[in-house]
Amino acid sequence: MKIFFKFLCLFLLFGCSETTFLINSAKRIGSWGDEPIYKVGNPYKINGKWYYPAVDYQYDEVGIASWYGPGFHGKTTANGEVFDQNKISAAHRTLPMPSVVKVTNLENGLVLEKVRINDRGPFARNRIIDLSKKAAEELGFIKNGVAKVRVEILEDESRKYV
């Protein structure tokens, strides 16, 4: 009986330690909700064109921005978050998710100091970033639909997610 009792105690002890390990692992991995999931991503092909996601802390590009919202509101983004068109966020074809960028509207001088990349896109020709409806409103191009912008990665803010 003593041997059985010792075996039972050891079994329960090891069972508890495994449960603790799994709980701690889940905390480190994060969740789909409040804490964003970091991922660079694998190469992918859209409409016959290959895209190669990569870490690029020197990213600085001028081009056309567009915005997206109603058709995607409430749907899951490429990194697993729920898209909210009323929050400032963006889609980019190759930057890690999440990354933080500064976006300047070169047509009117308005600036968004911090925009978090949490989705993939745009896949329309000649566009370098797709902004949420809220971000487009803040940058003053909601009615035009597109604007010439400068997108600069913010290295320190982006590294916080790694």
Question: What are the language-model segments listed below?
Answer:
Residues 1-2, 64:
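Short linear, low-complexity motifs centered on an aromatic residue
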